[in-house]
Amino acid sequence: MSVLSLRLPPLLLAVAALTVAVFGPSPARADRYDDAVAHAGRPGGDLKRDKIDHPAEVLRLSGIGPSMVVADFLAADGYYSELVSYLVGPKGHVYLLNNEAYDKWSENQWQGRVERLPNVAHETVPVEHLGLPARSLDAMLLIKVYHDLYWHPDEGPWPKDIDADAVLTEIARVVKPGGVLLLVDHSAKPGTGSADAGTLHRIDEQYARRDFENHGFELVGSSDVLRRPDDPRELITYKGEMVGKTDRFVMVFRRQR
């Protein structure tokens, strides 16, 4: 079960507390997030990933729902894009955004999803110039990719000169005031900032929080559903013994008006 923290007005907190005190906790029941995960026809590889990533709990924090316009930033094969497509429904729209590097790393596996999902559009764009209208998004997802903005490799397809400040400024431009940003990433040790982004592919949680707050976003919620206290936060995330076993932070921000 996720440990969820949301900022609610005092009156709503009082009502919630009274409800639990009088009636007890509500029995678990399926909602649109569970329904999205249970949707027929999802690829087998996605179902295996569900056991590690707990997508219903993560997406529930975002509040994404029918008719919304959502971007999945550096979506790779589009695992989350497909789930969001079910949440927003036929009147909503999902942008599956990759740059050339993420298209290459995903081996273009997003193509099958786009063919099946009429409300999902794939775009290959530079991360500093997303090509979307200003204030056009109800929500944006950054799932285990934010740390890459601070990675400056000497070789490979990832751009060597990405300006993280410019990318976050662009993200703030396209998310409408009041819109939501859902952030998930691999935890680095506290106080390390972005130092481990290029080596371990991790980033410090509080550094991430300050980064988004400095670009016009307010933290409004968090979840411990992907926490792994046994992770020493000293090993690389995408290969070796830590694959699927990393401590990950989950935060949701709201674009300030």
Where are these regions (language model features)?
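Class I SAM-dependent methyltransferase Rossmann-like catalytic core
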Residues: 33-61, 65
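Short glycine-dipeptide loop
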Residues: 67, 90-91, 175-181
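Conserved class I S-adenosyl-L-methionine
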Residues: 67-76
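A short glycine-rich, Lys/Arg-flanked "PGG" loop and its adjoining helix->strand segment in the class I
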Residues: 85-86, 158-177
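S-adenosyl-L-methionine
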Residues: 106-130
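A short acidic, Gly/Pro-enriched loop at the edge of an enzyme's catalytic core
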Residues: 130-140
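A short SAM/SAH-binding and catalytic strip from SAM-dependent methyltransferases
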Residues: 138-162
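Core SAM-dependent methyltransferase catalytic element
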Residues: 215, 232-257
